[in-house]
């Protein structure tokens, strides 16, 4: 049974509009990830945007709980139901139906469509919600309805705002399978399993804690797909269901080990984490040192450590991507389009971590011998900083030993060394916290952007706010103006804001707060609420922005055409004199690729294609082939822009014909983070300025070279540099003394000059069997390097032993390794010990 489809079809038959799953990266500065089904509708519940039509929605929302307040990462693999990635089925009513219908719908679906036995079902309600208690008695015996307090049956979004009692449906998995002291309704056991939560949003909580009835109560429900699938299939763990077992079976096949539930935590961790990794990568999140990308890295590295426990010593997670796409690509079709890209990103990240995991685990195990209760914060920091072990990975390993890590010391070291910190998730909402935008929205509704059609207009001032976003009736200083109709485009979708004039005041910026367009004006003549003013944009700036914005669409199309359909937009910036476009791709672009992309964009410009703008429902737009961006939030009808072969959803301003863009030049290509590249480019006047500057630079180079033929001048200089390098190398070359023991040439020596790696390579090339360790001191900095050729001795172990004597550390490959040291007084001791180690090995 396809429960996902059955649920959506059921509620569609009840007048609900099916809403596609929103992005995992939410349009909400307070959240790291979308972690519940109601997140996409939060602005409707809080009144920030008007109720939709129809006022009934249903969805299957993908969710991540692996960072921030809602974090299930530590429990995954060790319980039957915790996941970092899950799907939440939900039905929502925005001031339409309420408790009676919500309860009736839930009961009908559970008993008639899922056909769960009624004698296995129980219900909870809030202890003061007599209405819900009485309504449930129409469907289920009174004895099966339990009352609980706020802790279990009251839901609220935050300290203030919409809230209300909730009612939960439970499924009894059977006394014969669960008989612990906590296996009762309301207990912490697993016998009675919550499958559906119905939230009755009927109150508004004020700052002083007072609850006031909402004029139009709403419904928010959530049912976990993984949980209900397991119940329907008669499984006691989500991981034993058809949503996970194909992945677990593939893991078992790859590691050649049989999965047994009681000892299979590592299988479950990997199965869960590959789902999270696939969906996050598919939606544009990339491996990074901070923020969402760091959470993704933590998830994958935790899975890799569990893979190490199963015997995986090479990259393997990327081999599981096909199974996930086979399981879920039917509903989430974008997974199939991104499959090859996802596999490559996971493989590269695996190889990055696997190159250090063995050394890291060795250090962890050494410190474990000295640990009684608390693991050293210094060692935990070293594992993080040198070997890429996130702190929670170290904590996870310690948890298996019933130990804890000294987190306080770890954090102290992080701060002292200004190490990489997790991203600070503060958005535009912080700088406007004092502004009562909700009040403005309720008073005036959304003001209207007329800038698509008009460059100037007469408009009424609805509200004025000072620089601290406090409402004022008059404004002489700099501040914010809310016009009834505004021609000024607010910063959105990467496009920078319009500037211009309002009355005699210069408009410097326009931003959108709670769907209100507010323009920031310089100090000047007094403005009053109710004034009719003339508003005029800077048309020259708007035109240049439009040219650069349209060019990003052509660039996006060219990238997908030349590099592959895995390419998707990961960010953009559009200004009047430049554009910046971030996109998903696993490696730097070659010179040939950049030339082809630049050429393709200019071809599309020269084709002189008319811009076609259409408004249509989101699903119709997607079916037409229009590209929708994962980090954008779409509601109702959407605006579709067609420029030649490019077709995207976009609310920005654009040229009427591609020929207006002029010339397109790529200025720079660079990496942003793992799996994300960036192209910076210019068009139109900025392109002419770029070419002019390039020609001026070339002229300066000719003058410096004193040669009009730049290439021959550079070639001559390179030959001179090479000659000087060879002279320097020969002058600093040190003759290395060595001795032969049992056919192995050995050199252990301190040197002062020369290229230490080149000297080791030269030494190894001279002999069939060789071991060499060199210690070099420059500016009181100690560098060690070792090389081994056809001898049963590891260079990494040899150099590490010597480095530890010198108060340092290091390592590397079996045939070549480097390290650093600190204590100059112990160089002779390190040399002596290294020689003894080599002789013993032979």
UniProtKB/Swiss-Prot annotation:
Compartment(s) of residence: Cytoplasm
PROSITE patterns for this protein: AA_TRNA_LIGASE_II_ALA
CDD domains found in the cross-reference section: AlaRS_core
Listed SUPFAM superfamilies: Class II aaRS and biotin synthetases, Putative anticodon-binding domain of alanyl-tRNA synthetase (AlaRS), ThrRS/AlaRS common domain, Translation proteins
Family stated for the protein in its record: Belongs to the class-II aminoacyl-tRNA synthetase family.
Keywords: Aminoacyl-tRNA synthetase, ATP-binding, Cytoplasm, Ligase, Metal-binding, Nucleotide-binding, Protein biosynthesis, RNA-binding, tRNA-binding, Zinc
GO terms for cellular component: cytosol
GO terms assigned for molecular function: alanine-tRNA ligase activity; aminoacyl-tRNA deacylase activity; ATP binding; tRNA binding; zinc ion binding
Cofactor binding annotation: Binds 1 zinc ion per subunit.
InterPro entries documented for this protein: aa-tRNA-synth_II/BPL/LPL, Ala-tRNA-lgiase_IIc, Ala-tRNA-ligase_IIc_anticod-bd, Ala-tRNA-synth_IIc_core, Ala-tRNA-synth_IIc_N, Ala-tRNA_ligase, Ala_tRNA_ligase_euk/bac, DHHA1_dom
Major localization listed first in the record, in broad terms: cytoplasm
Enzyme Commission code: 6.1.1.7
Function, in words: Catalyzes the attachment of alanine to tRNA(Ala) in a two-step reaction: alanine is first activated by ATP to form Ala-AMP and then transferred to the acceptor end of tRNA(Ala). Also edits incorrectly charged Ser-tRNA(Ala) and Gly-tRNA(Ala) via its editing domain.
Catalytic activity: tRNA(Ala) + L-alanine + ATP = L-alanyl-tRNA(Ala) + AMP + diphosphate
Family annotation (SMART domains): tRNA_SAD (SM00863)
RNA-binding in keyword set: yes
Chain positions recorded as Zn(2+) binding sites: 549, 553, 650, 654
Cofactors required: Zn(2+)
Top-level taxonomic group: Bacteria
Description of its domains: Consists of three domains; the N-terminal catalytic domain, the editing domain and the C-terminal C-Ala domain. The editing domain removes incorrectly charged amino acids, while the C-Ala domain, along with tRNA(Ala), serves as a bridge to cooperatively bring together the editing and aminoacylation centers thus stimulating deacylation of misacylated tRNAs.
Protein name: Alanine--tRNA ligase
Gene it is expressed from: alaS
């Amino acid at each position: 049974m396809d429960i996902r489809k059955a649920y959506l079809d059921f509620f569609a038959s009840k007048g609900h509009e099916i809403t596609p799953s929103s992005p995992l990266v939410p349009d909400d500065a307070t959240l790291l990830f979308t972690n519940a089904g109601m997140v996409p509708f939060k602005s409707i519940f809080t009144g920030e945007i008007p109720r939709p039509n129809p006022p009934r929605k249903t969805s299957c929302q993908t969710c991540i709980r692996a960072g921030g307040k809602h974090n299930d990462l530590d429990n995954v693999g060790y319980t039957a139901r915790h996941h970092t990635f899950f799907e939440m089925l939900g039905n929502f009513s925005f001031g339409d139906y309420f408790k009676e219908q919500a309860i009736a719908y839930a009961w009908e679906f559970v008993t008639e469509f899922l056909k769960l036995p009624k004698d296995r079902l129980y219900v909870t309600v809030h202890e003061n919600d007599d209405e819900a208690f009485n309504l449930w008695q129409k469907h289920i015996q009174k004895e099966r309805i339990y009352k609980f307090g706020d802790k279990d049956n009251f839901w609220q979004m935050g300290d203030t705002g919409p809230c209300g009692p909730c009612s939960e449906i439970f499924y009894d998995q059977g006394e014969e399978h669960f008989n612990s002291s906590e296996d009762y309704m309301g207990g912490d056991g697993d016998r009675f399993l919550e499958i559906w939560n119905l939230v009755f949003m009927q109150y508004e909580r004020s700052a002083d804690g007072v609850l006031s009835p909402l004029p139009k109560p709403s419904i928010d429900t959530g049912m976990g797909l993984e949980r209900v699938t397991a119940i329907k299939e008669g499984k006691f763990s989500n991981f034993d269901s058809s949503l996970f077992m194909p992945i677990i079976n593939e893991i078992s096949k790859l590691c050649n080990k049989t999965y047994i539930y009681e000892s299979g935590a590592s299988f479950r961790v990997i199965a869960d984490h590959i789902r999270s990794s696939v969906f996050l990568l598919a939606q544009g999140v990339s491996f990074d040192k901070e923020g969402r990308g760091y959470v993704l890295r933590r998830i994958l590295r935790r899975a890799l450590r569990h893979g190490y426990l199963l015997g995986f010593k090479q990259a393997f997670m990327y081999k599981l991507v096909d199974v996930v796409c086979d399981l879920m690509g039917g509903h989430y079709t974008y997974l199939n389009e991104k499959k090859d890209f996802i596999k490559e990103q996971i493989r590269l990240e695996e190889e990055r971590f696997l190159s250090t995991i063995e050394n890291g685990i060795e250090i962890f195990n050494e410190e474990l011998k000295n640990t009684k209760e608390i693991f050293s914060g210094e060692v935990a920091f070293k594992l993080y900083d040198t070997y890429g072990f996130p702190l929670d990975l170290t904590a996870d390993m310690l948890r298996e030993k019933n130990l804890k890590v000294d987190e306080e010391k770890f954090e102290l070291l992080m701060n002292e060394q200004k190490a990489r910190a997790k991203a600070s998730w503060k958005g535009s909402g912080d700088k406007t916290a004092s502004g009562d935008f909700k009040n403005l929205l309720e008073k005036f509704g959304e003001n209207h952007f007329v800038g698509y059609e008009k460059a100037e207009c007469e408009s009424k001032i609805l509200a004025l706010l000072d620089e601290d976003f406090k409402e004022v009736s008059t404004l002489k200083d700099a501040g914010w103006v809310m016009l009834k109709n505004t021609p000024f485009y607010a910063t959105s979708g990467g496009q920078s804001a319009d500037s211009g004039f309002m009355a005699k005041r210069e408009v410097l910026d326009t931003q959108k707060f709670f769907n209100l367009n507010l323009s920031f004006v310089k100090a000047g003549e007094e403005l009053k609420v109710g004034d009719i003013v003339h508003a005029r944009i800077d048309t020259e700036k708007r035109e240049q922005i439009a040219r650069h914005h349209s060019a990003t669409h052509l660039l996006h199309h060219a990238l997908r055409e030349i590099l592959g359909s895995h390419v998707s937009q990961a960010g953009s910036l559009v200004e009047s004199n430049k554009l910046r476009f971030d996109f998903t791709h696993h490696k730097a672009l070659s010179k040939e690729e950049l030339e082809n992309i630049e050429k393709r964009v200019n071809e599309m410009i020269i084709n002189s294609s008319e811009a076609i703008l259409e408004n249509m429902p989101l699903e119709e737009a997607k079916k037409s082939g229009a590209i929708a961006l994962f980090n954008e939030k779409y509601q109702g009808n959407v605006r579709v822009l067609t420029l030649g072969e490019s077709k995207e959803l976009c609310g920005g301003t654009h040229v009427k014909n591609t020929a207006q863009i002029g010339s397109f030049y790529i200025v720079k290509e660079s990496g942003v983070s793992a799996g994300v590249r960036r192209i910076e480019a210019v068009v139109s006047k900025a392109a002419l300025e770029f070419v002019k500057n390039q020609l001026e630079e070339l002229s300066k180079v000719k003058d410096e070279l004193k040669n009009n033929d730049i290439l021959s001048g550079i070639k001559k200089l390179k030959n001179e540099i090479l000659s000087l390098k060879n002279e320097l190398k020969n002058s600093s070359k040190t003759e290395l003394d060595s001795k032969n023991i049992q056919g192995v040439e050995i050199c252990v020596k301190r040197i002062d000059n020369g290229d230490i790696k080149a000297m080791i390579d030269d030494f190894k090339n001279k002999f069939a069997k060789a071991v060499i360790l060199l210690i070099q001191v420059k500016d009181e900095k100690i560098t060690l390097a070792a090389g081994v050729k056809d001898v049963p001795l590891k260079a990494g172990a040899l150099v590490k032993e010597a480095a530890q004597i010198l108060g340092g550390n290091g390592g590397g490959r079996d045939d070549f390794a480097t390290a650093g040291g600190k204590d100059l007084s112990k160089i002779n001791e390190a040399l002596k010990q290294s020689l003894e180690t080599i002789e013993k090995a032979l």
